[in-house]
Amino acid sequence: MNNDTEYRKNPISVNKLLNKELKIPEYQRPYKWTRKNVADLLNDIGTAIEDNRRPGYDEFRYRVGTVIIHNKKDDAGNITERNIVDGQQRLITLSLIKRALDPSFTNSLLEHEYKDKDSVGNISDNYCFILEWKSVNSGKLEDYRGAFENILEAILIEVNDVSEAFQLFDSQNTRGRELDPHDLLKAYHLREMNEYAFEKFNLVRRREEIRPYRIRELFSLYLYPIL
């Protein structure tokens, strides 16, 4: 395997991952997680904290899922961008939780300029929910802060070749919204757009008003038989 197609797959603490300079590319779908998704994640973290206290489980680590990053490089081989291919929903949510636990915390995902109104609305609503959770769980906050450093980890896959990244795209986290096949095809084409990418992205999204089951039906009838 050459240097363009090889990839690295390693566990990484969530704290360290959130501090990386990550970019949300234009082809990514909006942030769709709801309060229920956030509540499930908070409960999972709480369970992980309890498990870590059990005798013999002090080295226990809870994996929040897999994150796929495409490392975009310049001609000299230096990384210029770390684009999130998979794991955006979890990373944004974990960043919101971390911010609520530590108001001084910020990262590239929190500073990102979200242009989609659904993303803005869901981020705002979920952060309000996390603050509400924080107000009634004040006795647990120190444990949750420690979990980010010592218990929570992700599997980080770093890919140099973008085609390889999209081949790995079907490695989905069970907590996330399942992707339809047209999401991948849309993403593959949108990543080639250089100018006016966001305007083109919105044009494609308007086409997505077609019900997903109809698109899946078209894929099964016409695309899959030739693959």
Where are the regions a protein language model picked out?
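Covalent nucleotidyltransferase
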Residues: 1-227
